Amino acid sequence: NILNVLIMIWFVNLYVKIVTRVIKLKHSDDEEFQLKFISSGMLSTSELSLLQAKKEIALYGQRTQRMFGMVKDLIHEKEGSETFSKIYSRIEKYEKISDRMELEIAAYLNQVADGRLSYDGKLQVSAMLTMTTEIESIGDSCFHLARTVIRKQEAKVEFNEGIEKDIDLMFKLVSEALDNMNLILDKNDMAESDLNKSYNKEMEINN
């Protein structure tokens, strides 16, 4: 046992380097524009193409939620610090990725719609286009929030404790709404309970 511990200690630095490199590569890959499911073009049937588009939209939703988390981090980071600048740069990059993903997914769906598609299939395309537009709108809102934080910094505005608590509460509620959105996007069939949960969360946010 002592020998095993000594060996582990000897290799600790190597483990750290490997893990750090893997995390860094994963982090870097995620922040480059790339479509995971529809990059290879149309599949043999429209139904399969729609399935791939659905997966891509689900991934789009996850990326947008990650962007929202960055905005929360930005608000709690010391303004003007190096970390603050890095987070803002990441948000800016994600916003550009979000815009490109919307365009690419929409172009793919329109291509699917031009093919042989059933009535139900056309309804699915219409719904997916709406989803894509709404997710892109969330990305835009995240970027606008980040810009507001920058303007707050430039104007040297300070929030009191009450305002900060209200902001944290709003972030919590919206984060829960995004959690539910992504759960729905991952499902093949949406239940009425999912819709009710989303509706109730929206009411909670608005109130």
Which ranges hold each PLM region?
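Cytosolic, long alpha-helical scaffolding segments
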Residues: 2-207
